[in-house]
Amino acid sequence: MYQFPIGVVVESFRKEIHEAIQEASKLGLDGIQMYGTRGDFVPEKFTAERRRELLNFAKDNGVKFSAICGDFGHGFMSVESNKIYVERSKRVVDLALEMETNIITTHIGVVPEDKTSERY
């Protein structure tokens, strides 16, 4: 029978990222998810060198990046701001691929029931 891997959002440890990865490893977890939309890990700040270092650190500790969180905190409800957030989301997708995952979690917002709504 397939055993589902268990992971954690590393920010939930409320520790520096390397310490959080070590905690996940100590708990025997398979995967980690981190935010790619805030702090030092937004793609604009998170250099290729630092990405490689963190990926290798995770691997050395026996965990993998199962997902990158691409949630900007408000969904994709505004046509005007979507111009910005869709472009930022593309950079999060690139970040996820560099961290060797193809899973990005996010919240798109509330989908209206009315299929004729502009937001639908």
Locate predicted features:
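Short polar catalytic/cofactor-binding loops
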Residues: 10-17
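Glycine-rich, proline-tolerant flexible connector loops at the mouths of alpha/beta enzymes
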Residues: 33-59, 108-115
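Glycine-/proline-rich flexible loop or hinge segments
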Residues: 35-40, 69-77
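Acidic (Asp/Glu)-rich catalytic clusters
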Residues: 1, 21-28, 45-67, 90-100
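Hydrophobic faces of well-ordered beta-strands that scaffold small-molecule active sites
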Residues: 4-10, 32-34, 65-70, 104-106
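Active-site acidic/histidine proton-transfer and metal-coordination neighborhood
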Residues: 16, 22, 59-61, 75-120
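Short, contiguous strand/loop micro-motifs
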Residues: 6-8, 40-42, 78-80, 117-118
